[in-house]
Amino acid sequence: MRVVILGSGVVGVTSAWYLSQAGHDVTVIDRESGPAQETSAANAGQISPGYAAPWAAPGVPLKAIKWMFQRHAPLAVRLDGTPFQLKWMWQMLRNCDTRHYMENKGRMVRLAEYSRDCLKTLRAATGIEYEGRQGGTLQLFRTAQQYENATRDIAVLEDAGVPYQLLEASRLAEVEPALAEVAHKLTGGLRLPNDETGDCQLFTQRLARMAEQAGVTFRFNTPVEKLLYENDQIYGVKCADEIIKADAYVMAFGSYSTAMLKGIVDIPVYPLKGYSLTIPIVEPDGAPVSTILDETYKIAITRFDKRIRVGGMAEIVGFNTDLLQPRRETLEMVVRDLFPRGGHIEQATFWTGLRPMTPDGTPVVGRTRYKNLWLNTGHGTLGWTMACGSGQLLSDILLGRTPAIPYDDLSVARYRSDFTPTRPQRLHSAHN
């Protein structure tokens, strides 16, 4: 089968890999000059299934009001003048109750855990290297309330069979020795020992080369104008004066998927702007061993071989990609506060990217009402965490194979009022 994949970020490239390994003739189309040039270029570097959680959570609406007046707020909203933004925010607010939060987090963890296992299998099969580490993730709490609130997420982890450690402040240095100097600022942490880290861009670029060697065609510097459709199927992709045809089409354009699908399929994917700093390491002993997540500022600090990646924050501001100095100051403040000796901050590279976010935090993966159009988009801040699982899942669905995990509640159909998902199995049963 001939398959066209739109998008060469980590989600598009992993989709191409799994589909080509299944025997399909795959072509990837992207406007950029190479893979992983936009959202996948400089993300936080975390592969953290247990921390997969929607931004739409109980208490977020009130917190958002308080954050409006805080210099280092993790979330900011500026109206972009579109009705779509208002509708998306309303849908997000409707997911901010406990029932929706637990439901959304449960399916996100299910896919993320599966994806981490798919990555392990891929790594063993190919030997791909991407400055990866398997040292776990440590979520840091600065208040007693944050420490107490961790019990809510622990319930989901236990149901998913995800191992964890709830640590008091005095024990944080056991897993991250550099935190010994700042333990007095913290109340404790939640550690997930099975989480991983790695350079998403490096992984995507190297996997793209492997995919190309396996027969995948990459069409870079090729802007897509529109999808061509008739009745219940897509019959081509218009790129300038060329129409590229295939038997099946996969939408993996991230934040740009919504506009490309306008008039074809309605998906609630909106850009969530984030920032990162990439800092050269000065004192290895003063840098993190693996990756930490600051719960107060929603910022991750991740160790690569010779660099520290600091990433986070969320701005609901449309497609604005301006680099704002106050956001850099927030990233610098957090890394200086926790790892003051770790890196040469003055030499840091400042970056911003647009994460494709759904109102419920769960990506949109699966079929559409068009019999040859498939979706793999809307992964938000978890594209790196969920990419391999989403690619394998999509390949299985397209081939008519039964996937290893329940998947019907990942499709765009879940936004229909009459949608009733099948009851998921316990998550650990899918990847033991």
Curated annotation (Swiss-Prot):
Record carries keyword Nucleotide-binding:
no
Answer whether the UniProt record assigns the keyword NAD to this protein: no
The catalytic activity, as recorded, is:
a D-alpha-amino acid + A + H2O = a 2-oxocarboxylate + AH2 + NH4(+)
Binding annotation for FAD: 3-17
Q: Which GO terms describe its molecular function?
A: D-amino-acid dehydrogenase activity
Cofactor(s) it depends on:
FAD
| Name listed for the protein in its UniProt record | D-amino acid dehydrogenase
Q: What is the lineage of its organism?
A: Bacteria, Pseudomonadati, Pseudomonadota, Gammaproteobacteria, Enterobacterales
